[in-house]
């Protein structure tokens, strides 16, 4: 049996301008939704001595971009939680895995992305948004079918592998961060977005 946690909510914009409702919606959906669903199914899996949890996280759980701090916080939380839970569940024959996509060609931005606003950040946020909505960048994202193939692989390969980096863009960004290190990577991100 497999439980696939795939709900997602994105909050972008300056943290200073985020409303309490925006923060609560982000936290209730991304980490708490996954934790609650998983907790509800653990007893059944434990009794059967088998089962697998798969959670869609994000490359945003390993790298960050400006004006996405709350979204990143929730995705980093899920990655850390999943890694810890793998130890906790393994003695009961239960697996846990994450699928870590980059950009996906869906209507997520129009359907699930919320923006916080604050006048002090308006100009910088606009510059960042122009980069994010650039058609060339969007065209490099994965299709939902490509990500579904990775989910299927995670569900059926029988491996104890924790993470499945999904999509060419996610793999490239993740590899780059590992290769150059945190500070050089962060400096590169800053240059891309702010010159």
Language model segments and positions:
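Conserved NAD(P)H cofactor-binding loop of Rossmann-fold oxidoreductase domains
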Residues: 6-11
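Active-site helix of classical SDR
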Residues: 38, 74
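Residue(s) in the substrate-gating loop at a strand-loop-helix junction
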Residues: 58
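Active-site-adjacent segment of SDR/Rossmann-fold oxidoreductases
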Residues: 63, 84-95
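SDR active-site lid
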Residues: 91-161
């Amino acid at each position: 049996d497999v439980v696939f946690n795939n709900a997602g909510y994105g909050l972008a914009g300056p943290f200073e301008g985020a409303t309490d409702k925006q923060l609560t919606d982000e936290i209730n959906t991304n980490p708490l939704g996954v934790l609650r669903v998983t907790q509800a199914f653990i007893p059944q899996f434990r009794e059967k001595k088998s089962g697998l949890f798969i959670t869609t996280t994000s490359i945003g759980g390993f790298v960050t971009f400006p004006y996405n701090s709350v979204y990143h916080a929730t995705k980093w939380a899920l990655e850390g939680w999943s890694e810890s839970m793998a130890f906790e569940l393994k003695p009961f024959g239960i697996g846990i895995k994450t699928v870590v996509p980059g950009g996906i060609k869906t209507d997520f931005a129009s359907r699930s992305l919320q923006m916080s606003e604050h006048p002090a950040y308006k100009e910088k946020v606009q510059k960042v948004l122009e980069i994010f909505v650039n058609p060339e960048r969007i065209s490099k994202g994965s299709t939902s079918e490509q990500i579904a193939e990775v989910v299927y692989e995670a569900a059926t390969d029988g491996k104890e592998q924790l993470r499945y980096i999904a999509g060419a863009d996610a793999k490239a960004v993740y590899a780059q961060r590992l290769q150059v290190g945190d500070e050089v990577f962060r400096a590169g991100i800053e240059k891309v977005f702010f010159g």
